[in-house]
Amino acid sequence: MEQYEKVEKIGEGTYGVVYKGKHRHTNETIALKKIRLEQEDEGVPSTAIREISLLKEMQHRNIVRLQDVVHKEKCIYLVFEYLDLDLKKHMDSSPDFKNHRIVKSFLYQILRGIAYCHSHRVLHRDLKPQNLLIDRRTNSLKLADFGLARAFGIPVRTFTHEVVTLWYRAPEILLGARHYSTPVDMWSVGCIFAEMVNQKPLFPGDSEIDELFKIFSIMGTPNEETWPGVASLPDYISTFPKWPSVDLATVVPTLDSSGLDLLSKMLRLDPSKRINARAALEHEYFKDLEVA
């Protein structure tokens, strides 16, 4: 850690404290994420080290760059490029989102980052507005924390005992699927897309069952016909209330028809029917976007 200096604590992430820091030689501002691993008596698991070293290879303009990994006895520090604004803060404070061109540009950049990660077989698993970071000067957006869930797992609570949000979690995960893949991230993107347009979360559940019911009451309760295999997922219950699906145009009323078409393809309950990131980038919703 000699080459890095902590400047101030800037937040508490899913895995530990996040500091604003400085590279002593270059003076570059960086973000230092301290990953706490108290439960590991024998130090940092080698699987985590392997996963994290793979992430250093990931380089894309829409992904927050992992610059370095510093390995201490009881913790790991991850050194990232520094960005001080996230999509949640931006949505809370900026009138920009009334302008659908901004929403479209941010959505496109999210998808571009995800397509890159998925092409390298890396999932995010915990996408939410708080880990989409924005560069104020250029309005460019970058995904943070990609691949960390695989290295460290997703805790139920953060180390400060805050509950990790369920609002963006895919139905197959909520239903206990052991094997899931890239569609889980596309579900999260759909939730974030709707939230940017509506300026409020689409499925703000406060428990796993409440989250499922919020999803089913809009998307319809799944069954073997609409989602083959759903009944054999560990947490599926045949006595779930049977909701019909609702027209998304009533749920996201200001979104145009091509936007609604894309959103509906991201929010398919059956993950095998969900659109993938590459196909989403080609969707007609983006045809009038000036791509930088």
UniProtKB/Swiss-Prot annotation:
One GO MF term: ATP binding
Disulfide bond sites: none
Modified residues (Phosphothreonine): T14, T160
GO cellular component terms listed in the entry, alphabetical order: cyclin-dependent protein kinase holoenzyme complex; cytoplasm; nucleus; NuRD complex
Record EC number: 2.7.11.22, 2.7.11.23
Reactions catalysed: L-seryl-[protein] + ATP = O-phospho-L-seryl-[protein] + ADP + H(+); L-threonyl-[protein] + ATP = O-phospho-L-threonyl-[protein] + ADP + H(+); [DNA-directed RNA polymerase] + ATP = phospho-[DNA-directed RNA polymerase] + ADP + H(+)
Entries under SUPFAM superfamilies matching the protein: Protein kinase-like (PK-like)
Record-annotated active site: D126
Superkingdom in the source lineage: Eukaryota
PROSITE patterns: PROTEIN_KINASE_ATP, PROTEIN_KINASE_DOM, PROTEIN_KINASE_ST
Keywords: ATP-binding, Kinase, Nucleotide-binding, Phosphoprotein, Serine/threonine-protein kinase, Transferase
GO biological process: G1/S transition of mitotic cell cycle; regulation of G2/M transition of mitotic cell cycle; regulation of gene expression; regulation of meiotic cell cycle; signal transduction
Residue positions, PTM Phosphotyrosine: Y15
Family: Belongs to the protein kinase superfamily. CMGC Ser/Thr protein kinase family. CDC2/CDKX subfamily.
Name listed for the protein in its UniProt record: Cyclin-dependent kinase A-2
